Amino acid sequence: MAGNRNNDMNVYCSFCGKSQDEVKKIIAGNGVFICNECVALSQEIIKEELAEEVLADLAEVPKPKELLEILNQYVVGQDRAKRALAVAVYNHYKRVSYTESSDDDVDLQKSNILMIGPTGSGKTFLAQTLAKSLNVPFAIADATSLTEAGYVGEDVENILLKLIQAADYNVERAERGIIYVDEIDKIAKKGENVSITRDVSGEGVQQALLKIIEGTVASVPPQGGRKHPNQEMIQINTKNILFIVGGAFDGIEDLVKQRLGEKVIGFGQTSRKIDDNASYMQEIISEDIQKFGLIPEFIGRLPVVAALELLTAEDLVRILTEPRNALVKQYQTLLSYDGVELEFDQDALLAIADKAIERKTGARGLRSIIEETMLDIMFEIPSQEDVTKVRITKAAVEGTDKPVLETA
């Protein structure tokens, strides 16, 4: 309510003491008055304090080098991809912090991330590790389970519900989280020509994902499933959610070779080395991704492309032993609870890596191979109190002999 100007009583600002004749406007409250100049000054003070809070928030976000150091503790290899992710994630949260406090004319757009790499190269684990290091909610979705609205399957909004659930239904916290969408290459258009039939899980899903990736206020059913009339919805703004999408994109290196003018190797010809194909993955540009089947609008919302390389046997052995949560360390800890020491021969580790490569499962297949090798041991050991040490040999991994047991 504005203070009334009258001839009988002059109104003064309770903060600066100026009269209503000295300012443009005085607003009256419960026994107090404030002028337009003090309102403007208050806004400026609040803005400065918010900016200081933002700088404090940003100080808590690890710098790119610090993020890389964290990733190096858990993820073996993929140095180029880790650098790209560290920079992209830091810039994203820097953008979020400044956008929330600044009214600058410059609109800082979101830089979502596309990770391209073979199965088991560490795409999902990289995204998980980043979210954990930043202490933000994290959700994983499988693109192949998604359909556009009106078809049997999972609506894209259900991805947001997973993030809200990960944030314990704290929507404000969820709005600064990370979503990883896997198998994104599986919803690529099957060829560049538009199909006459309806594309339920291809271009339509890309269009649906596009809306939430670029930033929108989405209505999410609190219990998941399809939307129904008169159903109470959770409103969530996706403009500050970081989307990381990943896929194997099998065969995309051939598109890169074609673009670069090189002949694609056919049947019966000598194949290029894996290292050569790995270097082609670093040459991927948006044109190649579009030819693979992602629509231009969708690609445009994924400006950061991180290409992951096929893991070698040496990489897999390092994954087994070096990270803080390495599988060998985990199984050694498990057996230590039974008072038993666990040791892997070097050639046994290499045999595990070779099996994973043979099965084309990469790092994600390592645990199942160890489980197969150690099943009988883990069954028997708790009942054999005289066993003090178990040694896993190459023969044990290959199934031609049993692990070596040492007794007291």
Swiss-Prot record:
Pfam family, one: ClpB_D2-small
One Gene Ontology MF term: zinc ion binding
InterPro entries, alphabetized: AAA+_ATPase (IPR003593), ATP-dep_Clp_protease_ClpX (IPR050052), ATPase_AAA_core (IPR003959), Clp_ATPase_C (IPR019489), Clp_protease_ATP-bd_su_ClpX (IPR004487), ClpX_bact (IPR046425), P-loop_NTPase (IPR027417), Znf_CppX_C4 (IPR010603)
Domain ClpX-type ZB: 1-54
Biological processes, Gene Ontology terms: cell division; proteolysis involved in protein catabolic process
Keywords tagged on the record: ATP-binding, Chaperone, Metal-binding, Nucleotide-binding, Zinc
Keyword hit for Iron: no
GO cellular component terms, semicolon-separated: HslUV protease complex
Family: Belongs to the ClpX chaperone family.
Subunit and interaction comment: Component of the ClpX-ClpP complex. Forms a hexameric ring that, in the presence of ATP, binds to fourteen ClpP subunits assembled into a disk-like structure with a central cavity, resembling the structure of eukaryotic proteasomes.
NCBIfam families: clpX, PRK05342.1
Name of the protein in its database record: ATP-dependent Clp protease ATP-binding subunit ClpX
